[in-house]
Structure formats: C-alpha cells, structure tokens
Curated annotation (Swiss-Prot):
Protein family: Belongs to the aldehyde dehydrogenase family.
One GO BP annotation of this record: catabolic process
Name the UniProt record assigns to this protein: Benzaldehyde dehydrogenase [NAD(+)] II
Keywords assigned by UniProt, alphabetized: Aromatic hydrocarbons catabolism, NAD, Oxidoreductase
E.C. code: 1.2.1.28
Reaction(s) catalysed by this chain's protein: benzaldehyde + NAD(+) + H2O = benzoate + NADH + 2 H(+)
Domain of life: Bacteria
Length: 44
C-alpha cells in the first residue's frame, strides 16, 4: 500500500504530511480495535 501507517499515523495532510497536536482514534467498527490515529487541525 502507498499509505503505510507510518506515513499518516498522528499526522494531517496540508499539502504535505505534518505532525498533528490533536488526534482522533480510527476504530474498526466490526471489532472495536484501534487501527491508528489521525491528526486534525483547529482554527487555533
């Protein structure tokens, strides 16, 4: 896969991958297992 976990885990894409201060857990609905964390941005 071109999107390995190391590329996006705890990061956000703003033209390039950047570390994020805030993250959400990515949950596999069927099992409830955490697949990783994605970063998100705020206005601050």
């Amino acid at each position: 896969s071109i999107f390995t976990k190391e590329l996006w885990d705890k990061k956000l894409f703003n033209g390039s991958w950047q570390s994020a201060q805030d993250t959400y857990s990515v949950i596999e609905v069927a099992t409830g297992x955490v697949l990783g964390e994605i970063g998100y941005a705020t206005a601050q």
